[in-house]
Amino acid sequence: MAEPIDAVVLSLDEVHALALRVLTHHGLSDAHARAIANVITQGQRDECHSHGVYRLLVCVRSLRKGKVDPQAVPTLRRLSSSIVAVDAHRGFSLLSFETGLPVLVEMTKQHGIAAMVINRCYHFSALWPEVEAIAAEGLVGIAMNPSHSWVAPEGGKEPVFGTNPIAFAWPRPGGMPFVFDFATSAIARGDIELHAKQGKPIPPEWAIDAQGRPTTDPQAALQGAMRTFGGHKGSALAAMVELLGGALIGDLTSRESMDFDEGVGATPCHGELAIAFDPKVFLGDDLDAGLARGERMFDSIVAQGARLPSQRRFDARARSIANGVRIPRALYDEIVALLD
């Protein structure tokens, strides 16, 4: 039996307070720090460890590199009656999302469908908190973004794509939304970083080494290239994200973002695209019937013992709200040391 990991137990309020202290200590404005602390706390709460308090190390590293503007104030520009663009001005993305969300919701409820573009942002976070926020308004949400070119196309050896996540949320009456958020790479970059940090091997289907050979060594994977999920299908979706979340919105592709970094190793700088749909506008008087169709499909999935996406997160959420979260002692100490 494996030895239990020495851990620190914190309430969610304590996690949020710790994140806020670390972020403001390193020069982030209160608005940026609160937006980031909110999402980091959500990640830790839902046991998404690669996007929980571990990301404080990532944020601070990027701030120390001098690329991110810790005081940037996002600005809004309406491109049309149903498209809003938020310029992050080289700040982290989360405050820009918070800034643009009310406008996206307003436009979607007016027109039935609307889009929000975030430009020139440093982006390190999961997308599910964002599409969940859209679903909390009774809307359907999709979000996507490129990153750094860490991922080789299927059949290739050289990195071209980012991890290029796609997230989707569907509101459910009286329950948690139907949500998925997955990288088009075989795994999130942060998971390989955590394996490297903990000295654990990775599955060979996650990555290739610098010579293009499948590897179980996370350090070799970080020096080589990640693989797409689902072979050519994942490759095609990754390319779609580059086009919609990069070229279409006038922002960097993953290769361009990597070049922009100039070897500094900061969080990727690029854009993001979020699209929202209002079921009330699409369905009108048939709204209840349309939502009921979705519920019947969900019932048919769980009735046979299958699990809806994000159910593991929702179960973890309930545990964390009741019992707090466990943070490995070594990681906790590393985070506290950021306050020195």
Curated annotation (Swiss-Prot):
InterPro entries: Mal/L-sulf/L-lact_DH-like_ah (IPR043144), Mal/L-sulf/L-lact_DH-like_NADP (IPR043143), Mal/L-sulfo/L-lacto_DH-like_sf (IPR036111), Malate/L-lactate_DH-like (IPR003767). Substrate binds at residues 55, 163, 189-190. It comes from the Bacteria. It holds the Pfam family Ldh_2. GO terms for molecular function: oxidoreductase activity. The active site is at 50 (charge relay system), 51 (proton donor), 191 (charge relay system). Keywords: NADP, Oxidoreductase. NADP(+) binds at residues 123-127, 181-183, 232-233, 307-313. Its EC number is 1.5.1.49. Disulfide bonds: none annotated. It catalyses: L-proline + NAD(+) = 1-pyrroline-2-carboxylate + NADH + H(+); L-proline + NADP(+) = 1-pyrroline-2-carboxylate + NADPH + H(+). Catalyzes the reduction of Delta(1)-pyrroline-2-carboxylate (Pyr2C) to L-proline, using NADPH as the electron donor. May be involved in a degradation pathway that converts trans-3-hydroxy-L-proline (t3LHyp) to L-proline. Homodimer. PANTHER family: MALATE DEHYDROGENASE, OXIDOREDUCTASE-RELATED. Belongs to the LDH2/MDH2 oxidoreductase family. This is Delta(1)-pyrroline-2-carboxylate reductase 2. It comes from Burkholderia multivorans (strain ATCC 17616 / 249). The lineage of its organism: Bacteria, Pseudomonadati, Pseudomonadota, Betaproteobacteria, Burkholderiales.
